[in-house]
Regions:
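Pyridoxal 5′-phosphate
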Residues: 1-185
């Protein structure tokens, strides 16, 4: 049967409106599709859970998440991050073969590493950048999602109040929807 993938943004990078990732993931899985999520806009503001612990449905999990830590506080020069369920990595040949992906080689034969985390990371890794990405996530965790969201919501409320008073500004999107402090007008 054909592979079905649903790939959505956890939040709009235009309006800041949040997606109900658990409900959408559940719907996708009930229809035999994989659930892929882009957290580029939402990642720095929300809790990122592959398997949300507070959800009743076992099919509300995410199969893959894409992150952009360079958008986080302290994140410039960090690499993009892919978090995916191990069973999705079934190809025994790496996408980009290179140094560090081969377990064995001789003139007649070769074998790639069995562990996809190592097999798919050919070449010289961006060590400093990866460490920086880890520190960015530690900073987010130390400050706390609730603190970040509360501060951002206060700033958003002030901005929206001022912009609504200006008749020549039209704010895009549903202002009553759960949203991040991202606004287009």
């Amino acid at each position: 049967r054909p592979l079905k993938i649903g790939s959505f943004s956890a939040a709009s990078n235009v309006t800041g409106i949040l997606s109900n990732t658990c409900a959408i993931a559940d719907l996708l899985h009930r229809h035999g599709a994989l659930s892929f999520w882009d957290f580029a806009a939402a990642g720095r503001y929300v809790r990122i859970e592959m398997n949300p612990p507070d959800v009743d449905s076992v099919s509300a999990h995410k199969d893959a998440i894409f992150l952009s830590p360079h958008k986080f506080i302290g994140g410039p020069s960090t690499p993009g991050v892919l978090v995916a369920r191990r069973e999705l990595f079934t190809n025994r040949v790496p996408v980009v073969p290179g140094g560090g992906t081969v377990a064995y080689v001789n003139p007649e034969d070769h074998a790639y590493l069995a562990d996809p985390a190592h097999r798919e990371e050919g070449g010289t890794p961006a060590i400093i950048e990866a460490v920086r990405a880890g520190l960015v996530f530690q900073l987010k965790e130390a400050v706390g999602v609730e603190t970040i969201r509360a501060h951002e919501e206060r700033l958003l409320a002030r901005a929206v109040e001022a912009w609504r008073a200006e008749p020549s500004i039209e704010i895009l999107g549903n202002l009553a929807a759960e949203r991040l402090s991202i606004v287009s007008f």
